[in-house]
Regions:
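Intrinsically disordered, low-complexity boundary segments flanking structured domains
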Residues: 1-2, 49, 70
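Negatively charged, low-complexity tracts enriched in Asp/Glu with abundant Ser/Thr
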Residues: 1-29
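Short linear sequence elements within intrinsically disordered, low-complexity coil regions
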Residues: 17-19, 25, 30, 51-54, ...
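Short aromatic-glycine-(Arg/Gly/Cys) micro-motifs in beta-strand/loop hairpins
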Residues: 30-58
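Mixed-charge, Lys/Arg-enriched low-complexity segments
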Residues: 53-91
Length: 91
């Protein structure tokens, strides 16, 4: 089950496990992106999180809206299906 919180941010939308690319580090390490999530710390800005298979955030991008996050993600990967996290209504 996808976590409700990532890096202390509330998860609003997430994806099923899939190949969303990879992150290459300067030391030669490669991490694969298995999940995408749209999160917020304060509801003023939204983050597009790239997560590994352990739900750890390995890259993030900041946007002004959820729609901007979704639009950016769709430029990199087509046919993304977003799942609304209904648990965030309690926060």
């Amino acid at each position: 089950m996808f976590p409700n919180i990532l890096d202390n941010a509330i998860v609003y939308f997430y994806t099923q496990k899939r190949n969303y690319g990879s992150v290459f580090y300067d030391n030669g390490k490669i991490e694969y992106i298995h999940y995408l999530a749209i999160c917020s710390y304060d509801n003023n800005e939204y983050y597009l999180f790239h997560c590994n298979n352990k739900f750890e955030v390995i890259a993030d991008y900041i946007f002004d809206s959820i729609e901007e996050c979704k639009n950016m993600a769709s430029k990199c990967k087509k046919d993304i299906v977003w799942i609304k996290n209904n648990c965030n209504e309690i926060y």
